């Protein structure tokens, strides 16, 4: 998946310990990396992208991912794409989806409170008010803000962690309007993909996120000023 994943599972009464669920979540993430990594020549994603493995012979989860990606692409007017730069790569959806599923494994095992963090994109569960620091893309080492909430997901796209890596599919260039955008929602799979699409939109992102049901956003523009959608204030920590 090209990122480090960390787990926060507080030791509290009612939280299962030693049931093996954390190991299952880690094994799931390793399987996702082996199956979906575009950097591994033998992964299903790489073989499917080259045309050497038909979809029917791929892991069934790939068809699930492709269906979800098509829906998000339609909702975003094509700003979310599985072919950034012309090469098949569904990573813009897969990372959030994999982390969300890892959190679901813990929930299914009875873990009432936990968070799973993959490179700053986080799925949180439980009544605890989780606090997530968002890096300032223009001032390395500083935070732009702290996001706080319960039972929610947070995803950020921008230039802080990996530099300019998101492409506007209509221009083929890195978008210039935003330095970063943080999206908050219920489920990380969609939240992360929406953050990617919104960053690619640049100045169009604010109105688009405002129209999404159940999602809010905070952005740092490339020039420095920030903006947020109308309901984002309740997530400020």
Predicted regions mapped to residue ranges:
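Mature catalytic core of soluble alpha/beta enzymes
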Residues: 1-237
């Amino acid at each position: 998946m090209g990122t480090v994943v960390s787990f926060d599972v507080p030791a509290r009464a009612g939280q299962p310990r030693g049931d093996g669920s954390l190991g299952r979540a880690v094994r799931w993430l390793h399987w996702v990396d082996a199956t979906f990594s575009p950097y591994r020549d033998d992964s299903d994603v790489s073989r499917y992208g080259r045309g050497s493995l038909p979809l029917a012979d791929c892991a069934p989860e790939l068809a699930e991912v492709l269906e979800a990606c098509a829906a998000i692409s339609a909702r975003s007017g094509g700003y979310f794409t599985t072919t950034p730069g012309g090469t098949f790569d569904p990573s813009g959806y897969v990372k959030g989806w994999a982390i969300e599923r890892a959190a679901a494994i813990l929930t299914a095992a009875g873990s009432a409170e936990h968070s799973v963090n993959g490179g700053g994109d986080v799925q949180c569960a439980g009544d605890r008010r989780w606090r997530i620091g968002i890096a300032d893309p223009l001032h390395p080492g500083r935070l732009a803000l702290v996001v706080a909430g319960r039972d929610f997901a947070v995803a950020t796209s921008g230039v802080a962690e990996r530099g300019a890596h998101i492409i506007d599919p209509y221009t083929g260039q890195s978008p210039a309007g935003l330095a970063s955008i943080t999206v908050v929602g219920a489920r990380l799979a969609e939240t992360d993909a929406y953050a990617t699409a919104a960053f690619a939109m640049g100045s169009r992102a604010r109105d688009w996120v405002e129209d999404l049901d159940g999602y809010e956003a905070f952005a740092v523009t490339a020039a420095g000023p920030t903006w947020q959608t109308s309901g984002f204030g309740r997530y400020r920590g």
